[in-house]
Amino acid sequence: MTAELATPRLLPRRFGLNKPKLEVHEGDLARADLILSRATYCDPQSNAALLGDKRLLFSPSGRSFLSYAPKGRTWLAFGAPVGQAEEAIGLAQRFITIARKLGAKPAFYGVGPSFEGIAEALDLQKVKTGERAILDLTTFSLDGKQRQVIRTHRNRHVKNQFSVRIEGPGAVRANLARLQTISDQWLVHQAGGEKGFGLGRFDVHYIDRLPLATVRAADGHIAAFACLWPSADKSRIGVDLMRYGEDAPNGVMDYLFAELFLWAKAQGYQAFDLNTSPLAGVEPCSSSPFVTNLAKLMYEHGEKLYNFQGVRRFKNKFHPEWEDVYLAAPKGVSHFVALARATLLINRPL
């Protein structure tokens, strides 16, 4: 049996989107969702495959997959393969082989420490493209001076009879109109509009596959929400879409995250992944000086595309550890071209 390649087809406009887009067949998304629920090898970011804006390459066993998007002659995988650890290297190699046979340039975007073994085995060259914020839940508490601001916001919201409700996949549709309103209000004040590829967007077919956390007033009115990226082995849980409405009280996101951290710890998760700050912490390096200089420049001056520095400031208030995130590619593949095309995929979702 050979690895299966699931390719997108053109679908009509759907709720939460501004235009038609290429999307993977629903059956393939269901397969990917099942693999995610059983995976022994995955990061929370692997859930971005459910966006439907990437192609899926399945392993011969059907127990693993890799998601990627073509842009020009570049094929960009988002993150590492997902599924069974023993299949990861073989599936990554299969992706490279298929891309080369079709005249494309393969690369892996947004990979972290879990990708080290694959990069070494396949002799891939890496360049840093950002940092990921990780909060250790095994030692987390709201005690101490470091957590004073977050603790104050939490206590005030509890006093004012707010609560956080965390529900499994399928909870979105019952509150769709309100969640859409919150999303629309939030987007008015954000640089660059909706994203894609490795960053979630408000698409009911995507967010309804994820656990949903909502902040509610005493009368049930929703003030804010966040979509969660779980991992089957409970090593980490992450957050993707997080938005609040115009009538949300000050500090509502601090309150939401405080409750999420406490809930995730009680559920047995080891760490909370606050997701990647693109281009953060990138310094010039001798192996790819042009790429790293460009990344640093974009981080410092690219606020119209993405609120790079604002995102990092928000995450820093929780005092996470920062781990490096890379773009990895075989020799002969331009990191500059791959990074430029990844930026286009993120900022111009299909």
Describe the predicted segments one by one.
Residues 16-76, 104, 109-126, 138-153, ...:
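A conserved beta-strand-loop-helix scaffold within acyl/acetyltransferase catalytic domains
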Residues 126-132:
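A charged helix-plus-loop insertion that forms the helical arch/lid used to bind
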Residues 76-86:
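Glycine-rich phosphate-binding "P-loop"
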Residues 296-300:
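Short beta-alpha connecting loops at secondary-structure transitions
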Residues 1-6:
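N-terminal alpha-helical membrane-insertion module
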